[in-house]
Amino acid sequence: MKPSHSSCEAAPLLPNMAETHYAPLSSAFPFVTSYQTGSSRLPEVSRSTERALREGKLLELVYGIKETVATLSQIPVSIFVTGDSGNGMSSFINALRVIGHDEDASAPTGVVRTTKTRTEYSSSHFPNVVLWDLPGLGATAQTVEDYVEEMKFSTCDLFIIIASEQFSSNHVKLSKIIQSMGKRFYIVWTKLDRDLSTSVLSEVRLLQNIQENIRENLQKEKVKYPPVFLVSSLDPLLYDFPKLRDTLHKDLSNIRCCEPLKTLYGTYEKIVGDKVAVWKQRIANESLKNSLGVRDDDNMGECLKVYRLIFGVDDESVQQVAQSMGTVVMEYKDNMKSQNFYTLRREDWKLRLMTCAIVNAFFRLLRFLPCVCCCLRRLRHKRMLFLVAQDTKNILEKILRDSIFPPQI
């Protein structure tokens, strides 16, 4: 007899799934909104994954999450490139886009300040991203605060502060303002090729000096040290440019997906909690043999298999999930206590105490007192139920993480 699954309503929660030093794109980014994503499919897909979780069908849930991430990946993201005039912002944008300065679509560059209004650019290397080339600071008497207001910093998702030759007070002010807005930002030191060609210091020492100078200036104003990249816009394959690209791709995924998937995880957590509550009630009030479809409700190993099946974390399902996510099954099983009863008992001291030799002997002696035996049996089952539910949450969190950043095999 196969155990039945209960349907429960779920409300979104916001667990601590992905801590960062910076606030997410939105602290209240509801998963099922379509105005952000431009897709009316998301509410439907969200409901289908919730239904799959209630029914213990994790593979169906994985398919839904993948569709969700694919849709979220199309959300437009705005990146502001800013800094002092003459720091090479336009040249950097061209290098980031892997485009020559003389091409028609390139950002104008030159000795004279060419960028007088903010200009947007796109790149096939960063789909659905708008790179904004902002006018440089310092060319007018305009304050940094007025500049921030005029350039509409509040509309930006991620900032790249360009510096060269020196890390000025304007750079520090920009960093402090952006940090106060809770936005992600990088500092990119350009023209490194020129620094290396004119410096008497070794390359290693010069790079250390630049980074230490940036850190010291930020610390004076209590600004948290952001990602810093030392590059040459003349060669986007050297120095920190590859690292910058990789970091940017990851942060774009975080900006688009982190908050919606945190909300979705909260919904999943609620569904798992509701299922636990339903089964606790059944354990307390119903025959365990009938509820679980087992012959011996004291056979903890067999009962554990049933609980894993109820939540969809049985061996076959976990194997299918791992294959679908493009990784080995041990990536998921390594974090599971409930792989088998021996492992579960070893990992959980409460269950180990409930099933130790002394308790088992006591259990056998009190066979003639059904109420006492029944109470102990139910305690064991509730503990197993709780542990399987915890494993389910861990697997769900890993699925969501891996859907944003696929594991490297």
UniProtKB/Swiss-Prot annotation:
Protein family (similarity comment): Belongs to the TRAFAC class dynamin-like GTPase superfamily. IRG family.
Alpha-K amphipathic helix: region residues: 350-374
Gene3D superfamilies membership: P-loop containing nucleotide triphosphate hydrolases
Keywords annotated in UniProt: Autophagy, Cell membrane, Cell projection, Cytoplasmic vesicle, Endosome, Golgi apparatus, GTP-binding, Hydrolase, Immunity, Innate immunity, Isopeptide bond, Lipid droplet, Lipid-binding, Lipoprotein, Lysosome, Membrane, Mitochondrion, Nucleotide-binding, Palmitate, Phosphoprotein, Ubl conjugation
Gene Ontology molecular function, alphabetical: cardiolipin binding; GTP binding; GTPase activity; phosphatidylinositol-3,4,5-trisphosphate binding; phosphatidylinositol-3,4-bisphosphate binding
Gene that encodes it: Irgm1
Organism: Mus musculus
CC annotations in GO: autolysosome; autophagosome; autophagosome membrane; cell projection; endoplasmic reticulum; Golgi membrane; late endosome; late endosome membrane
Tissue-level expression: Expressed in lung and primary macrophages.
An individual GO BP term: positive regulation of CD4-positive, alpha-beta T cell proliferation
Protein name: Immunity-related GTPase family M protein 1
Any Pfam family matching the protein: IIGP
Chain positions recorded as GTP binding sites: 84-91, 109-113, 191-193, 232-234
Protein task: Immunity-related GTPase that plays important roles in innate immunity and inflammatory response. Acts as a dynamin-like protein that binds to intracellular membranes and promotes remodeling and trafficking of those membranes. Required for clearance of acute protozoan and bacterial infections by interacting with autophagy and lysosome regulatory proteins, thereby promoting the fusion of phagosomes with lysosomes for efficient degradation of cargo including microbes. Regulates selective autophagy, including xenophagy and mitophagy, both directly and indirectly.
Residue(s) of cross-link: Glycyl lysine isopeptide (Lys-Gly) (interchain with G-Cter in ubiquitin): K270
Effect of R364A: No effect on subcellular location. Abolishes Golgi and lysosomal localization
Effect of substituting V359A: No effect on subcellular location
Domain notes for this protein: The alpha-K amphipathic helix mediates targeting to the phagosome membrane via binding to phosphatidylinositol-3,4-bisphosphate (PtdIns(3,4)P2) and phosphatidylinositol-3,4,5-trisphosphate (PtdIns(3,4,5)P3).
